[in-house]
């Protein structure tokens, strides 16, 4: 586990039980709700929520259809909170790479407001391609910022922050990770 992943783990372990009322929890809620609107699920689908936090997104998605719901997060305390809140879902403390799932085992993969914490984003995109079934979908909700804000975050703030933030990307950069992994149908 890299330095930034260790920082993320520490920060989210500390806020796990109060996440929904913390600024981070309130900020991420609309992004999660956007995924909930867009994700079309069928009974029997396998869903993986990466960096699932306290399980809110996965728990709500699992109510849309009779799905097999899996969530992973680097924070053990977030996973404990998720298990308590959504006992019908399966949760595990795990990093985002490598994904510990079989090839072509998932119908849907979601990531909400966490991609900027990933130390190896290209490896993550490759792993998504590996574990997704044919015609599977990845939903990523990530905030996009102006070039000036991105530059400040990436060169001034993140190198010195202790929150585990690695890099914020523009939409094209994010798209390129998935194109390089072999994804051909990418919507924004």
What is each of the regions a protein language model found here?
Residues 4, 22-26, 57, 140-181, ...:
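C-terminal alpha-helical "lid/dimerization" subdomain adjacent to the S-adenosyl-L-methionine
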Residues 48-50, 54-98:
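Class I SAM-dependent methyltransferase SAM/SAH-binding core
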Residues 44, 106-107:
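Local beta-strand N-terminus motif with an aromatic residue
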Residues 113-114:
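Short catalytic micro-motifs in class I SAM-dependent methyltransferases
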Residues 46, 136-137:
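Short glycine-centered segments of the SAM/dcSAM-binding site in methyltransferase folds
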Residues 110:
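A conserved beta-strand element that flanks and buttresses the S-adenosyl-L-methionine
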Residues 122-134:
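A short glycine-rich, Lys/Arg-flanked "PGG" loop and its adjoining helix->strand segment in the class I
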Residues 1-40, 56-60, 78-81:
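Conserved class I S-adenosyl-L-methionine
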């Amino acid at each position: 586990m890299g330095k930034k992943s260790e920082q993320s783990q520490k920060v989210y372990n500390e806020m796990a039980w109060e996440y929904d009322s913390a600024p981070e929890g309130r900020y991420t809620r609309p992004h999660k709700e956007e995924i909930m609107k867009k994700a079309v699920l069928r009974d029997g689908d396998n869903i993986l929520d990466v960096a699932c936090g306290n399980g809110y997104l996965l728990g709500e998605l699992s109510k849309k259809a009779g799905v097999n719901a899996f969530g992973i997060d680097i924070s053990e305390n977030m996973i404990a909170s998720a298990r308590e809140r959504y006992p019908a879902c399966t949760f595990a403390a795990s990093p985002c790479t490598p994904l510990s799932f079989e090839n072509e085992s998932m119908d849907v993969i979601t990531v909400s407001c966490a991609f900027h914490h990933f130390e190896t984003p290209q490896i993550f995109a490759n792993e998504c391609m590996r574990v997704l079934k044919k015609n599977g979908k990845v939903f990523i909700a990530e905030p996009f910022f102006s070039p000036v804000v991105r530059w400040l975050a990436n060169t001034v703030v993140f190198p010195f922050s202790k929150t585990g933030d690695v890099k914020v990307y523009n939409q094209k950069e994010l798209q390129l990770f998935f194109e390089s992994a072999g994804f051909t149908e990418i919507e924004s």
